[in-house]
Amino acid sequence: NLSDLLRKKHISVEIPENGCIEFSGDLEWTMEALMNLMKNCMEHSQSGGIVHCGYSENPLYVEVRIWDDGAGFDPEDIPHLFDRFYRGRRAVGNGIGIGLALARSIFELQNGTVTAYNLRNGGACFEIRIYSH
């Protein structure tokens, strides 16, 4: 449960009020995928950390970014993060490694992509793009 994790670790979530974005897709499955990415960021944030969300759109795609201020991904894990049942070197919790794979499948089924990378000043970032028809 995300709210339990937020309270337990005293994590803040920052989402700017940039207005609305629109895309063609399944809202419930998209929210499931976004929550999986947010959970990953929360689990890898230090107590008192911040998880950030940003979003924008252009004529080609809608873009959502979710990032944290944790240690980032182990570089050797990045190519495998979205593989089913893969648990990275810095894995926490008792997951079995399907959350990120599920998120990727959900976005790909909606003509989208999800990538993961380390931020220059520390932390990990997920970048989602859902393309227009």
Task: List where the protein language model places each region.
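Short beta-strand/loop element within the Bergerat-fold HATPase_c
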Residues: G48-L60
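Acidic ATP/Mg2+-coordinating residue in the GHKL
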Residues: D68
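Short conserved segment of the HATPase_c
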Residues: F73-Y86
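Conserved glycine-rich
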Residues: G112-T113
